[in-house]
């Protein structure tokens, strides 16, 4: 988590996305800069994942935990999810390329933007500390959740139902806390710089999405079929190799 949140702390470099805020202009593609570098945690991160595979948790019970952070994890929490969930909290599913306070992504984006643009107001790191406090609590809770999932391994439908319900309940409670943090941060900025500062942020966020990326049409069904074929072929090869070894062992005996 610390690695994916890293913004070149402890080095002689500064995050590239801080360049414009420092009055140094917009980074130019292909141009070398001795000070500003591209950090792991940057505004282009849409989601951050950590996959924690656990031998003791069978595949029928999720196989392990995926820790998910929407947007850049700089000031966002990683929530734990099992691989057998059937649905996610509504705030994850909000669509749109403009700020929307019902969206988990846009809520985190707003918090990150406020911290980045007004570092003097948030230099105490209280927001990051709150995220880490939540994560520490969930890490402790995961031990019990793992045992519950293992106990339901022979009932995969029940395991999925429980994992889904717990995941949505945790996300709902967390999103309420994120909204409180967002409002507190916005109020702090408004008190110091006026409400117009928040409107400026709205305009900047919307302007950042005026240029659309033209995606080339791609047949994802084809690549999925190819992937399944490759996986099946690999499984057959492994089976044949193991069978050959077993036969060879019997002949040696």
Q: What function would you assign to each model-found segment?
A:
Residues 221-241:
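Selective detector of the "anchor" transmembrane alpha-helix that sits immediately C-terminal
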Residues 235-253:
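C-terminal membrane-anchoring or membrane-association module
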Residues 1-221, 248, 252:
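C-terminus-biased signal that marks the final domain/tail of proteins
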């Amino acid at each position: 988590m610390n690695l994916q949140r890293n913004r070149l702390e402890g080095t002689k470099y500064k995050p590239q996305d801080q360049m414009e805020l420092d009055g140094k202009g917009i980074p130019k593609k292909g141009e070398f800069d001795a000070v500003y570098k591209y950090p792991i945690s940057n505004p282009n991160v849409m989601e951050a994942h950590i996959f924690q595979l656990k031998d003791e948790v069978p595949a029928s019970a999720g196989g392990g935990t995926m820790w998910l952070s929407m947007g850049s994890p700089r000031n966002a929490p990683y929530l734990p999810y099992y691989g057998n969930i059937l649905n996610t909290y509504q705030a994850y599913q909000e669509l749109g390329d403009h700020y929307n306070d019902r969206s988990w992504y846009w809520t985190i984006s707003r918090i990150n933007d406020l911290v980045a643009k007004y570092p003097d107001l948030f230099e105490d790191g209280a927001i990051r500390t709150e995220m880490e406090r939540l994560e520490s609590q969930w890490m402790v809770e995961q031990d019990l959740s793992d045992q519950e999932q293992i106990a339901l391994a022979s009932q995969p439908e029940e395991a999925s139902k429980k994992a889904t319900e717990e995941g949505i309940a945790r996300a709902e409670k967390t999103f309420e806390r994120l909204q409180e943090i967002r409002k507190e941060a916005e109020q702090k900025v408004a008190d110091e710089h006026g409400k117009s500062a928040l409107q400026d942020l709205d305009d900047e966020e919307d302007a950042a999405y005026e240029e659309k990326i033209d995606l080339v049409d791609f047949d994802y069904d084809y690549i999925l079929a190819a992937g399944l074929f490759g996986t099946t072929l690999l499984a057959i090869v492994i089976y044949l190799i193991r069978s050959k070894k077993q036969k060879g062992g019997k002949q040696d005996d």
